Regions:
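Short, small-residue-biased leader/transition segments that mark boundaries at the very start
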Residues: 3-6
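Transmembrane alpha-helical segments and their short flanking loops
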Residues: 12-31, 48-50, 68, 82-191
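Individual transmembrane alpha-helix segments
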Residues: 31-39
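Membrane-embedded helical hairpins/re-entrant loop segments and their flanking transmembrane helices
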Residues: 45-74
Length: 191
């Protein structure tokens, strides 16, 4: 893929004795950019949703799903979340699922473009390498810190949508009528 080629080209710049900068022909969009900043913790960067489920959910379904999903999510496996929440065919959860990687790509691109984070070479890490560790390996402490930033952002992007879904689940579990008033009451109890 061209992203892998971009990583290799970045490595060639270093091998030639030049600094890896945009001025020297360095590339921003590489395989590491995609793997470690757009799909980290799985497609849609769902770790924010998982953290909500584990620590803040009121519904039994979300609490249990969060506990079952936190382990796989740390290793970039999020199928339990994608299909059990569900995110698939769910217009409420589709919004943060799409928006989160877009926001992450803009923030990551900016960080690389401005030099806050060094451009990535051809160092590849296995796709199951947990975040923060993978950031350290592909770009040093700056990339690890950037992962902390984008993963924290994922929590706040997912938060209003997760609260709505949790309120729907909680109302159903407690046999409450699903009305705006009921949902607002349950949402107010979250975070």
């Amino acid at each position: 893929s061209s992203d892998v080629c971009s990583s290799d080209l970045n490595t060639e710049i270093l091998k030639s004795g030049k600094d890896l900068t945009l001025a020297n022909g360095g590339h921003i969009v590489t395989q590491q950019f995609l793997d470690q900043f757009l799909t980290v913790t799985g497609a849609g960067m769902t770790i924010g949703l998982v953290v909500f489920m584990v620590f803040f959910a009121k519904s039994a379904q979300f609490k249990q799903l969060g506990r079952l999903s936190i382990g796989p999510a740390v290793f970039n496996i999020n199928e339990p979340i994608v299909f059990a929440t569900p995110i698939v065919m769910n217009p409420i959860m589709a919004v943060p699922f799409i928006i989160t990687p877009i926001v992450s790509s803009v923030v990551t691109y900016f960080a690389l473009y401005t030099g806050l984070v060094p451009l990535f070479t051809a160092v590849q890490v296995p796709w199951t390498t947990p975040p923060i560790i993978s950031g350290l390996l592909v770009g040093g402490w700056q990339a690890a810190l950037l992962q902390v930033v984008v993963l924290t952002m994922s929590f706040f992007i997912y938060l209003p949508f997760a609260k709505k879904m949790d309120a729907l689940n909680y109302a159903e579990e407690t046999n409450q009528p699903i009305t705006e008033e009921t949902l607002e009451k349950v949402e107010a109890q979250n975070v």
